């Protein structure tokens, strides 16, 4: 009986030691966890129009088609939505076919969407006009990569980080276009047609 007590106490102590370490990585970088459902204060329509940063990949670097070795890549996005789908809190993003980030989105289980302070607008401008194929954009901007307990990359300079687990991913099917708006959009769009990525919001932190 006494032996069982000590084993149980030991396991409980180990759990208490492990759990905080998973949560403290973001807290150490100045973030506090919050509930998107209860404390998302932004206008859902305006939020994406203001542009956010999408990031996917992992700490482990992998060779690219160009022979480089990158662990993650990020890009500025202005299309997206946040709401409810399949009884989950969902966040949807769109990535064009020729974007370098698409490779990382297609090979990652999770992704993050980040906001930055207005004074850091250069981050969004640079991430939206430069390609990771030409070099490490985060390094060029002096951003510091960090990783969630799921191994999802984000930057410590962000003001808010939303982590999502991809539930659905597929390119738009032109056969499904029902108006001229998307047809005209892709008639002369060099980056190619977009893919939709619907993610379940699994974590969120803000400063």
Where are these regions (language model features)?
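Active-site-proximal mixed secondary-structure blocks
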Residues: 26-207
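Bacterial N-terminal signal peptides
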Residues: 9-18
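Sec/Tat signal peptide C-region and signal peptidase I cleavage site
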Residues: 20-25
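Bacterial N-terminal signal peptides that target proteins for export
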Residues: 1-10
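Short intrinsically disordered, low-complexity coil segments enriched in acidic
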Residues: 1, 18-19
């Amino acid at each position: 009986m006494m032996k069982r007590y000590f084993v149980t106490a030991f396991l409980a102590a180990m759990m208490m030691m492990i759990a905080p370490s998973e949560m403290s990585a973001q807290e150490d970088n100045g973030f506090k966890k919050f509930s998107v459902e209860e404390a998302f204060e932004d206008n859902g329509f305006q939020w994406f129009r203001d542009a956010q940063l999408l990031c996917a990949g992992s700490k482990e670097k992998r060779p690219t088609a160009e022979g480089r070795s990158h662990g993650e890549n990020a890009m500025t996005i202005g299309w997206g939505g946040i709401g409810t789908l399949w009884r989950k809190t969902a966040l949807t993003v769109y990535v064009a076919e020729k974007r370098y980030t698409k490779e990382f989105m297609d090979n990652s289980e999770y992704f993050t969407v980040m906001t930055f302070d207005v004074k850091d607008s250069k981050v969004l401008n640079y991430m939206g006009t430069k390609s990771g194929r030409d070099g490490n954009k985060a390094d060029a901007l002096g951003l510091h990569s960090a990783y969630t307990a799921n191994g999802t990359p984000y930057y410590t300079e962000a003001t808010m980080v939303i982590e999502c687990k991809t539930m659905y991913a597929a390119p738009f099917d032109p056969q499904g276009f029902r108006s001229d708006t998307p047809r005209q959009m892709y008639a002369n769009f060099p980056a190619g047609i977009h893919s939709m990525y619907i993610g379940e919001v699994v974590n969120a932190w803000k400063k």
